[in-house]
Amino acid sequence: MKKVLNIFTIALIIIFAIISCQEGSDSSSSASYSNKVIKVGFAGDSDYQIWNPIVSNLAKEGITVELVTFADYTIPNQALNDGEIDLNAFQHYAYFNDEVSNKGYKLTAIANTYISAMNIYSKKIKSVSEVKKGDKVAIPNDPTNGGRALKVLEAAGLIKVKPEAGDTPSVSDIIENPLNLDIITVDAGGIYSLLPDVACAVINGNYAIDFGLNPGSDYIFKDDPAIYSGNSFVNLIAARTKDKDNELYKKVVAAYQSETVEEIYANNFKGSYLPTWK
């Protein structure tokens, strides 16, 4: 009997030792994360609704994420390239590829997030059929969002652009402008403020939400992803190329590509954001 008790005691010691090692491993894993703050940049304020729950969930794993918001689209890629932030999540592939190609940034897309509607909005008219000759129309001034806006205007029947210009035509690619519209190009984040002064404007989904517009109902013309080719306007998470396989960043991606975020898309963004990782 004594021998049996000794064997039982030894077995318990081994079991507790294994459990202790596992707990120590988990603790050391969390500790290894605690010294690293992952800075994630994005443009506008609407994406806080997405990222705040992600930050909370990652904190439970001992991973600290700091959110950094930028006033416009021209800064987050430079900030990422310069090491001021670790990841950014604000742009689609067309914009990202243009920035990398033209500015030489050493950045890589590490995950897909969503595609966002880019609708036409107005404070003066209820339909694009009410646009008159010589009216002013505002679009973003960067090449990719401006190009996308022109495709939306084309889909609305207001202009026609050269087919060979693809998904990102420029104003010079307009081949038909029957109403002789005055197309004004301004920073994407500043377009909403021009709505009282123009007939209509093409506004990015995140900025529309930031300024209280409902992308599911407030438009006078609704964007249709079918008019674009490939993944040009799918949004992404980017990292510096040298860090594209970083294990911590993979955990951030996993936390983003989750049912929690899908529910936020559906409930908070009124159908404007559609997940693209499935």
Task: List the predicted regions and their residue ranges.
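A conserved helix-loop-strand patch within extracytoplasmic ligand-binding domains
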Residues: I110-I159, E262
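A bilobed periplasmic-binding-protein/Venus flytrap-type ligand-binding module shared by bacterial periplasmic
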Residues: A117-V128, S232-N246
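Short, polar/charged alpha-helical segment
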Residues: V37, G41-V68, I75, A79
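Short, low-complexity disordered leader/linker segments with a strong preference
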Residues: M1-V37
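Short helix-initiation/N-cap motifs at beta->coil->alpha
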Residues: L67-Q78, G166-S193
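Periplasmic-binding protein-like
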Residues: N145-E154, Y256-T276
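Immediate post-signal peptide segment of exported/extracytoplasmic ligand-binding proteins
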Residues: G24-K39, L58-K60, V128-D135
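Ligand-binding "clamshell"
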Residues: D98-I110, K124-I125, D197, V202, ...
